[in-house]
């Protein structure tokens, strides 16, 4: 699967206690002329201190097991080629795309969230 908007990936994000843990990440843009894309992670919703911009329910993606939220503060602009290389090496795993409605909520949240970095907002034209 090519690196493109709506693609969902499982990216290594383990902790000391769970080094093999992976979190769901969503690619939020197609590659631009420089081959860059915006990617954002999904994390477990633990309390009201979590970013409220886009809260997801377990039924919104097969990988989600419980209520989660989009971790806009860690949204990044990354090289699509580097991401593709990580997929080909098996470090990053591909999974089912996000449905169109959920993706639209995630993408709109990049501009709405007060936690999205300024450089990501500028890149997206927010």
Over which residues does each language-model region extend?
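Compact nucleic-acid interaction/catalytic patches
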Residues: 12, 17-63
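C-terminal terminal-subdomain/extension
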Residues: 60-126
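Loop/turn positions that initiate beta-strands
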Residues: 5-8
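Generic structural signal for residues positioned in beta-strands
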Residues: 10, 38, 55, 69-71, ...
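Mixed-charge, Lys/Arg-rich low-complexity intrinsically disordered regions
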Residues: 1-3
């Amino acid at each position: 699967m090519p690196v493109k908007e709506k693609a969902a990936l499982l990216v290594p994000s383990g902790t000391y206690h769970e080094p093999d843990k992976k979190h769901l990440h969503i690619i939020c843009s197609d590659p631009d002329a420089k081959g860059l894309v915006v990617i954002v992670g999904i994390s477990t919703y633990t309390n009201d201190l979590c970013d409220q911009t886009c809260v997801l329910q377990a039924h919104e993606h097969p990988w989600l097991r419980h209520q989660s939220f989009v971790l806009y503060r860690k949204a990044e602009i990354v090289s699509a080629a580097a991401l593709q290389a990580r997929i080909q090496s098996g470090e990053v795993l591909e999974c089912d795309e996000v449905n169109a409605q959920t993706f639209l909520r995630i993408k709109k949240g990049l501009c709405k969230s007060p936690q999205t970095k300024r450089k990501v907002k500028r890149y997206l034209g927010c």
